[in-house]
Every structure is written in C-alpha cells, then in structure tokens.
C-alpha cells in the first residue's frame, strides 16, 4: 500500500493523555477531549449532521454492518466524502469480528478497502477486532501502513498485547481490561476510551440487519 495523498496534519493528540477519550459514541462529547465515532444513520444521511465546533470525528464501516451487502456498499461509497471533512480525523471503527457480521473473507475485503482510504488520506485507524487478530496482523504485515492502527477496547492477555505492539499497533483500553497487558503497554502506544453511549451497540446491530 502506498500513500497517494499528502497527509494533512492530524488533529488527534500526538501524545496519548489520560483525559482524552480515544473512542466514544457520545455525540455530545466536549470539543478537543474525545474522538467521536459517527453512527451509520448519520453516515447515510449527511444532510442531518452538523459538526460541532472543535469536535473530532471518526467514520467507518463497523463489522456488524457487513452482513447486509447493500448497506455495507452504501456506507463505503459515502466514506470518501466524509474523509474530506476537516473534522474527520480517523477511519473507524472498522475491523473484523468472527462472531458477528459477514463471513471473515467478506469482512476482510471491506476492511482492506477502508485501510486503503486511511492510507490515502493519511488518517489513523480505529480497529474493532474479535477473535480475528491473526488476520489483522497479516494485513498489517502485507500493507505496511504509514498511519497508526489502534485496537480499541483491548481486553486481551499480555502475550497478545506484546505481539500486537511488536507488530506496530497501538492499544486503547476501556473500562474492562487485563491489568498486566495495560502495564506492559508503553505510554506512547496506550490510549484510553469510554466507548460510550448506551445505545451504540443497538444502533450497529439494527443497521446490520
């Protein structure tokens, strides 16, 4: 994978901090304090969206939305326009989920397309990964990205954390995590998140049907 677009200056904090929420679905998160993942209904209907001043957003196709091909295609086709928005500073959450969504082969195709857009626009990637870390590791080795890939909501064991860190991933920790994995993650590769709001899972599940 090669960069074909001059990366803009990223608005995300270069150095992780305890008071920055790296991944939330709370549309009312305070400006400059969080990376807000926009829901699928907003991505499909941009005319309903008004960006709040100073708020940073991420956009992507969630794995749970991949088992409806028409919906997945509609969301992916809208990504380029969203990625050109000056307040969209990351791609995601996107990724692979072995328990929900389309077949992993199909999910991998969708994810690869999004990773290409992230590389083109010079944007970091927020990854949702469930029982598919081997495939994500293979993708990173194959694509050699120039932008950060962060596994959000990481709950894995220390051995998996070490494997991901050695491969160049960053890790984001939420309310539930393995303390040993957290401790061994260097601060410069460690993010913190809330993954709020309460209805986020219901939204993704509804749009994946």
Q: How would you label these PLM feature ranges?
A:
Residues 1-209:
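Mid-domain alpha/beta scaffold segments of enzyme catalytic cores
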């Amino acid at each position: 994978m090669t960069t074909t677009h001059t990366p803009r200056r990223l608005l995300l904090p270069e150095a992780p901090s305890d008071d920055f929420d790296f991944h939330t679905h709370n549309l009312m998160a305070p400006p400059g304090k969080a990376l807000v993942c926009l829901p699928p209904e907003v991505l499909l209907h941009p005319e309903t969206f008004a960006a709040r001043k100073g708020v940073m957003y991420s956009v992507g196709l969630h794995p749970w939305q991949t088992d409806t091909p028409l919906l997945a295609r509609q969301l992916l086709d809208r990504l380029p326009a969203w990625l050109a928005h000056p307040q969209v500073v990351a791609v995601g959450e996107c990724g692979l989920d072995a328990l929900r969504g389309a077949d992993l082969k199909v999910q991998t195709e969708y994810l690869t397309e999004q990773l290409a857009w992230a590389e083109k626009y010079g944007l970091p990637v927020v990854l949702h990964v469930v029982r598919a870390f081997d495939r994500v590791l293979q993708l990173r080795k194959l694509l050699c990205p120039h932008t950060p890939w962060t596994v959000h909501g990481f709950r894995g064991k220390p051995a998996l954390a070490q494997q991901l860190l050695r491969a160049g991933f960053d890790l984001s920790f939420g309310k539930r995590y393995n303390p040993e994995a957290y401790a061994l993650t260097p601060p410069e590769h460690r993010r913190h998140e809330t993954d709020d709001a309460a209805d986020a899972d219901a939204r993704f599940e509804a749009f994946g049907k």
